[in-house]
């Protein structure tokens, strides 16, 4: 076989149909778009229209709402914090808060605050100031001899959690 003998299989490449090029082509005049109207125009489609049938987005019930008071936290686990301490990115002797974690690159941005979660093991004695922390995370920090200061306002017993 020579390089000049290489060719595509028969029928593997089909030429595109040039529409709107006279009635003899079979795709002249309306170019396969039917008659006049909205769907014959370019760039126009009726989004969600199902031919008169009730569209799916109207058949399904509305549900839920967006809470405008919702807080979005940057979450950090104990193992990630320990990795940063081992890599000397975070000083274990200093107070660890959101600004320190962002500066060290442990969290990208503080968002509405940092929440400490309990995955992993902590070996260092730390003083941590975070907006919130899970019970296992607090227990692990205190077991290692450290303290956790929660910056979030404390909810009363009467308030819903």
Curated annotation (Swiss-Prot):
Composition bias type Gly residues, residue spans: 21-37
Pfam families noted in UniProt: Ribosomal_L27A (PF00828)
Disulfide bridge positions per record: none
Keywords, comma-separated and alphabetical: Ribonucleoprotein, Ribosomal protein, RNA-binding, rRNA-binding
GO CC list: cytosolic large ribosomal subunit
Region (Disordered): 1-44
Single Gene Ontology MF annotation: structural constituent of ribosome
The keyword Ribosomal protein is annotated on this UniProt entry: yes
InterPro entries: Ribosomal_uL15, Ribosomal_uL15/eL18, Ribosomal_uL15/eL18_sf, Ribosomal_uL15_bac-type, Ribosomal_uL15_CS
Keyword Ribonucleoprotein on entry: yes
Entry's Gene Ontology BP terms: translation
Gene3D superfamilies for this protein: 3.100.10.10
Family assignment from sequence similarity: Belongs to the universal ribosomal protein uL15 family.
Known role: Binds to the 23S rRNA.
Assembly mode: Part of the 50S ribosomal subunit.
Alphabetical list of NCBIfam families matching this protein: rplO_bact
Designated name of the protein: Large ribosomal subunit protein uL15
Organism per entry: Rhodopseudomonas palustris (strain BisA53)
Species classification: Bacteria, Pseudomonadati, Pseudomonadota, Alphaproteobacteria, Hyphomicrobiales
Gene: rplO
């Amino acid at each position: 076989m020579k390089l000049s003998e290489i060719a595509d299989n028969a029928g593997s490449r089909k030429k595109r149909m040039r529409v709107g090029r006279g009635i003899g082509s079979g795709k002249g005049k309306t170019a396969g778009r039917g008659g006049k109207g909205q769907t014959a125009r370019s760039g126009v489609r009726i989004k969600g229209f199902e031919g008169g049938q009730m569209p799916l987005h109207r058949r399904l019930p509305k549900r839920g709402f967006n809470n405008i008071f919702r807080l979005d936290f940057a979450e950090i686990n104990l193992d990630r914090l320990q990795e940063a301490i081992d890599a000397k990115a975070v000083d274990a002797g200093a107070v660890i808060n959101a600004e320190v974690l962002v500066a060290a690159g442990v969290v990208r941005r503080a968002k509405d605050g940092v929440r400490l979660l309990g995955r992993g093991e902590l070996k260092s004695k730390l003083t941590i100031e975070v907006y919130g922390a899970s019970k296992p995370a607090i227990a692990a920090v205190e077991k290692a001899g450290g303290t956790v200061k929660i910056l979030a306002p404390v909810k009363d017993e009467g308030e819903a959690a």
